Amino acid sequence: DPETGATQKIMPDAQPGDVIFKDLNNNGVIDDGDKTFIGDPHPDVTYGLSITLGYKGFDFAVTGYGVAGNQIAKSYRNNTNTTFDNYTTEILGRWHGEGTSNRLPAIDGSAINYGYVSDLYIEDGDYFRISNVTLGYDFTRLFKSKYISQLRLYASVQNLFTFTNYSGMDPEIGYGGGDDWTSGIDLGYYPGARTYMFGVNLKF
């Protein structure tokens, strides 16, 4: 109290390693009145990149895309950071005693206040993905044939690499099951696979 100087514990049952919540409405307790909007699932910028090069029968192409200015709610963490579920290696940075991490809470099956959605779950959703890289060569440059106009061999990689600071499995989470409410919420979908392809273009 600013007038009397009296203090009051707003989380009287909190234990070392618990998540500390902020009393946003200053009523002295943590309740539904302290809930607010955190993060924005909508990118400020969506962009793409396409580069195509050719030289003496060789061709090279790169495509990529990305977003910037959005946040992701890593909600599947609520289901995996419990006593009998699987953990990610991130849990190695949890609080487990004085002087250890103050970023991740302690894991204790009897104290699960970290299960409430908070900014602990909100992360930067910016990313740039190299979606395709292709390298090819047209062997008709080496020999001429009146029957073959193109004999091109190529190799291609899809989903080559993603640049991101997001700690989840894939920052490109999309919309789960077509439901609008899942925009920006990572429900733990398995990320897209990297694919290697080899092919031939033959024209007569």
Regions found by a protein language model. Give the residues of each.
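Membrane-embedded beta-strand positions of outer-membrane beta-barrel proteins
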Residues: 62, 153-155, 200
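Residues that define the transmembrane beta-barrel architecture of outer-membrane proteins
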Residues: 43-47, 126-131, 149, 192-196
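Extracytoplasmic gating/loop element in the C-terminal half of outer-membrane beta-barrel translocons
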Residues: 2-9, 13-18, 67-158
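Conserved small-residue
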Residues: 1-39, 158-160, 165-168
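Outer-membrane beta-barrel pore domains and translocons
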Residues: 54, 65-67, 156-160, 203
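Extracytoplasmic loops and strand-loop junctions of Gram-negative outer membrane beta-barrel proteins
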Residues: 29-37, 42, 87-91, 113-121, ...
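Repeated loop/turn-to-beta-strand initiation elements of outer-membrane beta-barrel proteins
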Residues: 57-61, 143
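C-terminal beta-signal and terminal closure region of outer-membrane beta-barrel proteins
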Residues: 91-96, 164-204
